[in-house]
Regions:
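Acidic catalytic motifs of isoprenoid enzymes
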Residues: 1-230
């Protein structure tokens, strides 16, 4: 962000804060799935301008876990200031931000609410997960770049495709890097379909991580991730 031209840096910084706020809702351990869905819905309405940011913050802040990071708590309590800046951007900039937040807040809960040590079904589901947490951000950034750099507009369609692919590569890298941390949190984002042995179960990964089946599956995921990053 610091290397971007100032007008673009301002809107990208604001977009980052909006995404962080959406993540804060999703990651808070004290909120039920129903509460998360409701606050995600309200947050989208706040960003769109059809709900009051102060009432949103006042309702959400007292419900956050005592373990929430101070910076994340400040994001929630200062949502009105953040969104006020959002609403000062151009229509096209606001449209890009609203689309990203809407897709993220509507897509993340389905995965988060069903997360378990069983992992995802296959590569298609993994791709869908990567899209709602990373691909939509890449699309938003592409739209903003095209707004601020008119010479890029002729390449927009190709850049949008590459943004989704690169986002998946980055998210898959995070998934592979965080396998054991995610497992401690009761989560696994690995796709079951790449582990071809019918007896291999991701729930038993602490016992099976040294098997050839696991090694082959991980190598395949690394290859897929690398291909997306090379795009």
């Amino acid at each position: 962000i610091p290397v971007l031209p100032k007008p673009l840096a301002e809107v990208v910084t604001n977009a980052y804060l909006l995404c962080r706020l959406a993540d804060t809702i999703e990651d808070d351990v004290a909120l039920s799935n129903q509460q998360k869905s409701e606050f995600h819905r309200r947050f989208v309405s706040v960003v769109e301008g059809s709900d009051n940011a102060e009432s949103f913050s006042s309702a959400l802040a007292p419900l956050l876990s005592s373990s929430v990071l101070p910076d994340e708590y400040d994001l929630v309590t200062n949502a009105a200031k953040i969104v006020r800046i959002t609403h000062g951007f151009s229509i096209k900039e606001q449209e890009a931000l609203i689309r990203c937040i809407t897709l993220m807040c509507s897509g993340m809960p389905g995965f988060q609410h069903n997360k378990s040590l069983k992992g995802l079904r296959g590569l298609d589901e993994l791709g869908a997960y990567c899209y709602v947490v990373a691909g939509v951000v890449g699309e938003m950034l592409t739209e903003l770049f095209c707004v601020h750099c008119p010479e890029l507009r002729g390449k927009r369609d190709e850049m949008m495709r590459l943004a989704v692919s690169f986002g998946q590569g980055l998210q898959m890298t995070n998934i592979l890097k965080d396998i054991w941390d995610d497992r401690q949190a009761g989560t696994c984002w690995l796709p079951r379909s790449v582990f071809v042995d019918s007896d291999f179960e991701l729930e038993q990964l602490d016992k099976l991580y040294g098997t050839e089946v696991f090694k082959i599956g991980i190598k395949k995921l690394i290859s897929v991730s690398h291909r997306h990053l090379r795009d």
